[in-house]
């Protein structure tokens, strides 16, 4: 199984890896789009990049980082991203076999494997990045069907834990998706928003470290239940699971 995670706006700076080597990244069919985005992103001066990226002057170093993407040090993608989901995942304690089950969606790289080395950058899935001839295409338009096509070549079950914005960059027909809901005092359900990433990080860790290999949504649910989680299979949408917290 391949567990597809969302990226994080917060990232670990620095790195000890060699500069970005696009041809070495997983899913090489995404290289051309990656190349064009890196070129357009690097062409923006920090002053111009701030409003495009939707960040304040306080985050100017993020915009500066985008100008040195080809020469900056790198680190494994799963360690580059930080924040709530990645804290719960605790990737630095995972075995190579567990890490091999993880991939990460992003606006800059489309999809990478956990061990792919990437630099520090700033770019979200909702950004409209100026391109050639004065156009400002959305990230969805830039990626088109390339992410979907690349993931169609994966011959194992995909568990898509990306947020809606990143799912829109490349939908995966047949993938297992997960909703996180909490039970209120009166017994009704509420979709979890604030801690959604935390619980998905916990689920990703459970799945990545499982000795079992899931091939169906039901088997994903069984693995999670075996770890003490409450998971339901939605009637009528067998690929959609609900994690109840």
Curated annotation (Swiss-Prot):
PANTHER family: PEROXIDE STRESS RESISTANCE PROTEIN YAAA, PEROXIDE STRESS RESPONSE PROTEIN YAAA
GO biological process per UniProt: response to hydroperoxide
InterPro entries: YaaA (IPR005583)
Pfam family, one: H2O2_YaaD
Protein name: UPF0246 protein CE1889
Family: Belongs to the UPF0246 family.
Transmembrane segments: none
Origin: domain of life: Bacteria
Region of interest (Disordered), residue spans: 1-20
GO cellular component: cytosol
């Amino acid at each position: 199984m391949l567990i597809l995670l969302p990226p994080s706006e917060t990232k670990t700076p620095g790195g000890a890896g060699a500069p970005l080597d696009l041809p070495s990244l997983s899913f090489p069919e995404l290289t051309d789009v990656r190349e064009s985005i890196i070129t357009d992103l690097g062409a923006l001066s920090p002053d111009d990049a701030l409003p495009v990226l939707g960040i304040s002057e306080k985050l100017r170093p993020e915009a500066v980082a985008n100008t040195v993407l080809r020469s900056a040090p790198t680190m494994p993608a799963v360690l580059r991203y930080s924040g709530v989901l990645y804290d719960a995942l605790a990737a630095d304690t995972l075995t190579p076999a567990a890490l091999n089950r993880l991939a990460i969606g992003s606006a800059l790289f489309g999809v990478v494997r956990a061990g792919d080395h990437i630099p520090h950058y700033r770019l979200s899935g909702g950004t409209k990045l100026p391109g050639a001839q004065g156009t400002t295409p959305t990230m969805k338009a830039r990626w088109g069907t390339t992410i979907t096509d690349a993931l169609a070549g994966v011959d194992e079950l995909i568990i898509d834990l990306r947020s809606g914005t990143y799912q829109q960059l490349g939908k995966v027909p047949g993938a297992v998706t997960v909703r996180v809901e909490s039970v209120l005092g009166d017994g009704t359900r509420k979709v979890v928003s604030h801690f959604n990433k935390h619980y998905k990080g916990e689920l990703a860790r459970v799945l990545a470290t499982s000795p079992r290999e899931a091939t169906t949504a039901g088997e994903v649910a069984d693995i999670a239940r075996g770890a003490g989680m409450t998971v339901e299979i939605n009637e009528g949408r067998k690929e959609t699971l609900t994690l109840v917290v």
